[in-house]
């Protein structure tokens, strides 16, 4: 059987080391068990089974992240250290519980602080986010996983993260039951396991792809500034 050769061969070194950063926006502090953190750990374990990686799980509730849009908003601000981790990561997992049908306040704070990188891109045409792969992890004891997933995906896409197919894993427990009582169900849930495995496979594949074939920014500064000007223009 005749097989055509790809016009542009895609050489992806299988042993390319990857940095994977998981940002847990649970409102619980250490040492309390975080359901979101447990699912993030499951995804990270799947990633480690696939590739040579360095993984780190950061619990945002244990950091000091003041309100604001700059790189440093107070004398005590952990954002500069956190943004360094984000810049050196190949894959960033955005992990949040569902609170009142939406993402947690800490996930919203993270998104707001990331605006500093978006503004840097607008001003300089150089992006610290382009070429990075994003994944999403969600847990909760109420409905809303798909809504939260979609809203986060929209933000990350506009910021410049690459979102592979099936790049999210979630688990939603029985309404009215504390998620701590559902722990064993969560850890055995086949659909959640399938999503975690698919998420890991896809973020690793696309991270390797972009490492081997980095994106080229096309008129980054002008394009981004033009987009901002369009969004700021009064509606007719």
Question: What are these regions, as identified by a protein language model?
Answer:
Residues 125-173, 191-194:
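Short, glycine-/small-residue-rich phosphate/pyrophosphate-handling segment
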């Amino acid at each position: 059987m005749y097989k055509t050769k790809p016009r542009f061969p895609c050489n992806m070194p299988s042993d390319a080391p990857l940095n994977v950063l998981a940002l847990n926006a649970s409102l619980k502090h250490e040492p309390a068990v975080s359901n979101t953190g447990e699912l993030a750990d499951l995804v990270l374990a799947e990633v480690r089974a696939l590739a040579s990686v360095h993984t780190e799980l950061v619990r945002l509730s244990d950091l000091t992240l003041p309100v604001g849009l700059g790189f440093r908003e107070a004398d005590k601000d952990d954002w500069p250290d956190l943004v360094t981790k984000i810049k050196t990561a190949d894959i960033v997992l955005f992990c949040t519980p569902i609170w009142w049908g939406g993402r947690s306040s800490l996930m919203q704070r993270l998104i707001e602080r990331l605006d500093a990188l978006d503004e840097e891109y607008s001003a300089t045409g150089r992006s610290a986010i382009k070429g990075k792969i994003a994944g999403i992890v969600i847990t909760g004891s109420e409905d809303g996983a798909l809504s939260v997933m979609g809203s986060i995906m929209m933000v990350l896409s506009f910021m410049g993260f690459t979102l592979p197919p099936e790049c999210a894993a979630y688990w939603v427990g029985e309404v009215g039951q504390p998620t701590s009582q559902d722990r064993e169900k969560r850890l055995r849930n086949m659909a959640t396991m399938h999503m975690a495995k698919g998420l890991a496979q896809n973020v690793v594949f696309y991270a390797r792809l972009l490492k081997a074939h980095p994106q080229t920014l096309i008129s980054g500064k002008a394009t981004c500034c033009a987009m901002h000007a369009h969004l700021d223009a009064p509606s007719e």
